């Protein structure tokens, strides 16, 4: 699709938006129900596409993508009428002849740019929120996950007219063309570098943006932690989707007094969860492409590897890898890993560690394994991060009841559930003056 085609599509959507069709709540509900039915009908095809793009098992595809999308639709269908209501708010005494109201309204034509690592979930979740809020949407999925992108395009055509929702496929040229256009809102999920470009381009039209980015998310294991529990949940969160998860624990900070015992548990858990030959395990996925395969492989210092480290270039698989005696100066600590490599650093002072974490770019997530409630409150209150867990990893994003989003370098804005509806809504304020009663002369 060239620049002219994209421009015409946007104008067609804008005309449809100003026809006021999307303001009808019942039509939004009908659209979401139609999408839900389509997803349920295509569950097998979704799993096949995700396996082709990322090597995901059927269980992982449903648990981490399809099931979460269906949950978000169900949540929105349950609450959309309440979210859409006009709300009366307090009016100050100085305006006692008036009444004040707020009411959410859609922005208009929205651009959603989604990534390749969870291509179905991260395309459909923001789409659901945008539709629920009454917007029209142009969805641009990643070219790196072509099978899933092609299926999404097919499903969207079945469910919606292009005036309401349309998919633009392609690569960098299409991304560039889209960002030259005037949208009413842009929602981007991806890397920090591209996020900066999205923000720069959006500023030309003063278009509001949500940026869901990433970063190096720390995971702290203190001396009081249940090490077996910590190892099991860290291994799950770190190596899920071959580490290609924006909120995966990027590196481990383990108290020096328990590090050896913790690493012993980590090795056991990798074998338990992925078998003795993870490169041939059906429960272990693959790296998205050769570019990222070589980038991740280049981060591994084989002199510091204590587990894993092998790979298969033909299948784009890298073993779950653990590196010990890592320092903050090592290559693996200079960028977000986004792969199955776990660097382990040690610490002795929690206060010093908090200072170190806060001196680095703000991460999307933070995890802390501890039995010390005082320490847990200290870390969550003093560290700057998007979201996280105490004694678990990654599951904080798998709910419609809490907003999910970054902070600082890891992004801005949030979504899921009510926060997703708010993200794609402009809240209009109205003050209605009530005429004074006629006074007797």
Predicted segment positions?
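ALDH superfamily catalytic-core signature
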Residues: 160, 193-327, 390
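Residues at or immediately preceding the N-termini of alpha-helices
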Residues: 6, 25, 43, 227, ...
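Residue-level signal for inorganic ion chemistry
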Residues: 28, 73, 134, 165, ...
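N-terminal Rossmann-like NAD(P)+-binding subdomain of aldehyde/semialdehyde dehydrogenases
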Residues: 1-101
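Short, well-ordered beta-strand elements within core beta-sheets of diverse protein domains
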Residues: 15-21, 112, 219-221, 251-256, ...
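Structural signal for hydrophobic packing residues in well-ordered secondary-structure cores
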Residues: 17, 21, 36-39, 43, ...
């Amino acid at each position: 699709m060239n620049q002219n085609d994209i421009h015409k599509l946007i104008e067609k959507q804008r005309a449809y938006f100003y026809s006021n069709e999307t303001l009808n709540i019942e039509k939004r509900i009908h659209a979401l129900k139609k999408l839900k039915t389509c997803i349920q009908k295509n569950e097998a095809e979704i799993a096949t596409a995700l396996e082709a793009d990322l090597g995901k098992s059927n269980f992982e595809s449903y648990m981490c993508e399809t099931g979460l999308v269906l949950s978000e639709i169900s949540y929105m269908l349950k609450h959309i009428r309440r979210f859409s209501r006009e709300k009366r708010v307090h009016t100050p005494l100085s305006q006692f002849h008036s009444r004040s109201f707020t009411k959410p309204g859609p922005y208009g034509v929205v651009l959603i740019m989604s990534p390749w690592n969870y291509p179905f979930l991260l395309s459909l979740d923001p789409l659901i929120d945008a539709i629920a809020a009454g917007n029209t949407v142009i969805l641009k999925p990643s070219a790196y996950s072509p099978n899933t992108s092609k299926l999404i395009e097919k499903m969207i055509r079945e469910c919606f007219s292009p005036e309401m929702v349309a998919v633009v496929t392609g690569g960098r040229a299409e991304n560039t063309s889209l960002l030259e256009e005037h949208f009413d809102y842009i929602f981007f999920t991806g890397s920090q570098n591209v996020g900066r470009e999205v923000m720069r381009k959006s500023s030309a039209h003063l278009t509001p943006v949500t940026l869901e980015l990433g970063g190096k998310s720390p995971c702290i294991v203190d001396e009081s932690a249940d090490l077996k529990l910590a190892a099991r949940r860290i291994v799950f969160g770190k190596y899920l989707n071959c580490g290609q998860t924006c909120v995966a624990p990027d590196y481990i900070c383990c108290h020096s007094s328990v590090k050896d015992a913790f690493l012993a548990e980590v090795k056991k858990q990798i074998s338990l969860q992925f078998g003795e030959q993870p490169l041939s395990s059906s429960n272990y996925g693959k790296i998205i492409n050769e570019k990222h395969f070589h980038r991740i492989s280049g981060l591994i210092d084989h002199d510091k590897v204590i587990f894993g480290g092998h790979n298969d270039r033909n299948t784009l698989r890298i073993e779950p890898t653990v590196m010990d005696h890592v320092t903050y100066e090592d290559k693996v600590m200079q960028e977000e890993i986004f792969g199955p490599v776990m660097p382990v650093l040690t610490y002795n002072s929690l206060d010093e560690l908090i200072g170190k974490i806060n001196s680095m770019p703000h991460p999307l997530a933070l995890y802390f394994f501890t039995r010390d409630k005082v320490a847990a409150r200290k870390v969550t209150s003093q560290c700057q991060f998007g979201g996280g867990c105490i004694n678990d990893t990654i599951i904080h994003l798998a709910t419609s009841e809490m907003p999910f989003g970054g902070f600082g370098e890891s992004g801005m804005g949030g979504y899921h559930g009510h926060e997703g509806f708010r993200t794609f809504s402009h809240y209009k304020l109205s003050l209605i003056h009530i005429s004074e009663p006629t006074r007797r002369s």
